Design a protein with these regions (language model features):
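A detector of single, family-specific signature residues
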Residues: 1-176
Length: 176
């Protein structure tokens, strides 16, 4: 199994290289931290990241990820295309001539963008998005469903901010 395979590799590394998992893990975590900082630094050098950073709960790393996945924005004609690219559009289940029912998320497109938006939604519902989160929860929607709705909302806001080159304004929550 996997555990046995890992044990064999760990013994090999320890025996021939003097390396143990205890020494590798902190080194890998440190390298990951440095890479994240470099990514944010690289994307911060452009002006577009500041617009996404202005959204409450969106971290610089998530903002950089969202920006990297959306660029160039002019390849999309409509916001619905961007939502579909993120895989945040509902799938339609249809059979024969019967009208379709909306099901779960389609999950087409960029998995990385979808995950970044979901994490951003998870961070934002503690801030300016809390009233919106509570309103959807009071309608009987599950926590995950509301986070998916907030993900779409964040995507719409992010695209509007990038196109209009403006900082986040809580009034956007009522307009999008």
């Amino acid at each position: 199994g996997v555990a046995g395979s890992l044990a064999i590799h760990e013994r090999y590394l320890k025996q021939y290289r003097g390396i143990t998992a205890a020494t590798v893990t902190p080194q890998m975590l440190a390298k990951c931290k440095v890479l994240k900082e470099r990514i944010v630094q690289q994307w911060s050098s452009g002006n577009d990241l500041k617009y996404l950073d202005s959204i409450p709960g969106v971290t610089p790393f998530l903002g950089a990820t969202i920006l990297a996945e959306l660029q160039p924005l002019d390849r999309f004609q409509k916001i619905d295309q961007i939502i579909a690219f993120a895989g945040l559009d509902p799938s339609v289940k249809q059979t024969g001539g019967k009208p379709g029912n909306h099901g779960a998320l389609s999950k087409r497109g960029s998995r990385t963008l979808r995950q970044a938006l979901y994490l951003a939604a998870f961070g934002t519902f503690h801030h300016a998005f809390r009233p919106l989160y509570d309103a959807y929860r009071n309608r009987g929607l599950a926590h995950t469903e509301v986070l998916c709705i907030l993900s779409r909302k964040i995507l719409r806001i992010a695209v509007a901010l990038l196109k209009k080159r403006r900082m986040f304004d809580p009034a956007y929550l009522d307009r999008t």
